[in-house]
Amino acid sequence: MGFIKHQISPFFRRRKFSDKFSDTTDFITANWRPLLKMLTIAILPVCAIQALSLNNLTSMMYGELASDSDDTMGILAGFGLNYGATMILGMIASLFLISIVYALMKLYHATNEDGTPVNEDLTKMTFKEFLPYARRQMGAAWKSVLAFMLFFVVNILLVVAIIAVLQAANIGVFMILFAWFVALIPPAMMLIPVYSFEPTGFWAGMRKAFVYGFKTWGGIVAITFVVSLITNVICGFLSVPYMLTAMAKAFLVIENSDGFSFVNSTWFSLISYLSALLYIYVCYVGYSALLIAIAYQYGHACSALDIDNFDHEDKDFDDFDKDATNEDNF
């Protein structure tokens, strides 16, 4: 018997805040098994390497606290290398995360004419069967990541240019620029679902994302705040082992305690690595919940605003199912 037996709520529809939250929790409740399975297979290896980079970064920092080295260039090069590796791995994991979450959402919301789900039991889908769907989403994920990078680079350059023109860097200027930047973040979050759920170009998608974002600014802030609060509490609790190992190492190094030899031992390094791995993996799982909530906010915005008369229908996700299947058969 199928895992999903009820009629699924349409993806593209107007939603109140309670509807956005309930649709998010309904999706997670119905699909937590395939979601965790796909995320674990795709992202855990990246997390394993990222945990090494993160541990190397903290070890270098605490090692420099314990030594009196004057090799500033060597220290900066080491920090830059490990920090850069951590960021690149984070970007790769984000691409996998976006592709997996939104491919699964399309499969979940693909419906027949009578409203029944096309895919009745996603729990039985193997990673090999799921891979073509995630691969089809990778291009959209790349667009959203590049758009985010462009957004941050442009804003940083604007801030630098404004400060240079005003020839002032007082607290008032910083507060105004900071408030302006924060106000732009909710619309920027709509970049991810716009590229993922619509066949749009790079600049057209960016324009549409910011129109959706500004017109539904309050809704984005409300749903992301609540979902982020819940996920941050869970992630914060599960990150305690890593935080404790990092704090213990920092304390023993700064105090130059006899326990410094213990924090450099194999056992402590293994515990520190595993706790960092758990911390990073849990954070990505938490981010998936935020992506789901933003997607339902996007579905609401499409129905409420109907920009460019785009034909938003859940049966379009059935084409995604068929196209990915045909692609896999080549």
Where are these regions (language model features)?
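Juxtamembrane transition segments at transmembrane-helix termini in multipass membrane proteins
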Residues: 2-7, 11-12, 60, 65-73, ...
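N-terminal low-complexity, Pro/Thr/Ser-rich intrinsically disordered segments
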Residues: 119-121
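Non-cleavable N-terminal signal-anchor transmembrane helices
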Residues: 1-79
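Hydrophobic alpha-helical transmembrane segments in multi-pass membrane proteins
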Residues: 38-59, 82-98, 142-185, 223-250, ...
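Helix-boundary and loop/linker segments of multi-pass membrane transporters
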Residues: 26-30, 72-77, 131-135, 166-167, ...
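Short helical patches
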Residues: 1-8, 21, 138, 165, ...
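Interfacial aromatic "cap" segments that immediately flank transmembrane helices
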Residues: 13-46, 124-154, 186-234
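Proteins with a high burden of low-complexity, intrinsically disordered sequence enriched in S/T/G/P/A and R
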Residues: 161, 169, 209, 308-313
